[in-house]
Amino acid sequence: MSIEVANESGIDVSEAELVSVARFVIAKMDVNPCAELSMLLLDTAAMADLHMRWMDLPGPTDVMSFPMDELEPGGRPDAPEPGPSMLGDIVLCPEFAAEQAAAAGHSLGHELALLTIHGVLHLLGYDHAEPDEEKEMFALQDRLLEEWVADQVEAYQHDRQDEKDRRLLDKSRYFDL
């Protein structure tokens, strides 16, 4: 799976974390593992321009998604022809997201993970224009975020245990004389 990230926002964010959450969601949603995704991070001025051009709405927004093909919820970009399929582009605005994160009382990283999940779901055909769609999409988004965080915690704990085991084994070598 290829995920390209271009950060033109001027804000330092963890691109590895964005890729991690996108990969997690794509895998959980059973998308073809050869799928490709592009992520672009913009400043508020550039995002406002994009928002006006594509949505005819003034001001910046947090996330926009541009799917390559229209998909229905549950649809998969795993066409029978060989080769990777392009899901589309996700555009994030970290500066705008930072304001939302502060208002919600969580970190920018948490907000960007949430917005990445939101963007991927849009690429897969989910929407929130109608109340029922919103309920379904936001519940799925929250569940995926919770599962990704749990996965990250488990990986961290596993890495810490591996490090402890390595140090213990290194110390035990002194007794093998």
Curated annotation (Swiss-Prot):
<keyword id="KW-0255">Endonuclease</keyword>
<feature type="binding site">
    <location>
        <position position="128"/>
    </location>
    <ligand>
        <name>Zn(2+)</name>
    </ligand>
</feature>
<dbReference type="Pfam" id="PF02130">
    <property type="entry name" value="YbeY"/>
</dbReference>
<dbReference type="GO" id="GO:0006364">
    <property type="term" value="P:rRNA processing"/>
</dbReference>
<keyword id="KW-0479">Metal-binding</keyword>
<feature type="binding site">
    <location>
        <position position="118"/>
    </location>
    <ligand>
        <name>Zn(2+)</name>
    </ligand>
</feature>
<dbReference type="InterPro" id="IPR020549">
    <property type="entry name" value="YbeY_CS"/>
</dbReference>
<dbReference type="GO" id="GO:0004521">
    <property type="term" value="F:RNA endonuclease activity"/>
</dbReference>
<keyword id="KW-0963">Cytoplasm</keyword>
<dbReference type="GO" id="GO:0004222">
    <property type="term" value="F:metalloendopeptidase activity"/>
</dbReference>
<keyword id="KW-0698">rRNA processing</keyword>
<dbReference type="GO" id="GO:0005737">
    <property type="term" value="C:cytoplasm"/>
</dbReference>
<dbReference type="InterPro" id="IPR002036">
    <property type="entry name" value="YbeY"/>
</dbReference>
<keyword id="KW-0540">Nuclease</keyword>
<comment type="similarity">
    <text>Belongs to the endoribonuclease YbeY family.</text>
</comment>
<keyword id="KW-0378">Hydrolase</keyword>
<dbReference type="GO" id="GO:0008270">
    <property type="term" value="F:zinc ion binding"/>
</dbReference>
<keyword id="KW-0862">Zinc</keyword>
<keyword id="KW-0690">Ribosome biogenesis</keyword>
<comment type="function">
    <text>Single strand-specific metallo-endoribonuclease involved in late-stage 70S ribosome quality control and in maturation of the 3' terminus of the 16S rRNA.</text>
</comment>
<feature type="binding site">
    <location>
        <position position="122"/>
    </location>
    <ligand>
        <name>Zn(2+)</name>
    </ligand>
</feature>
<protein>
    <recommendedName>
        <fullName>Endoribonuclease YbeY</fullName>
        <ecNumber>3.1.-.-</ecNumber>
    </recommendedName>
</protein>
<dbReference type="InterPro" id="IPR023091">
    <property type="entry name" value="MetalPrtase_cat_dom_sf_prd"/>
</dbReference>
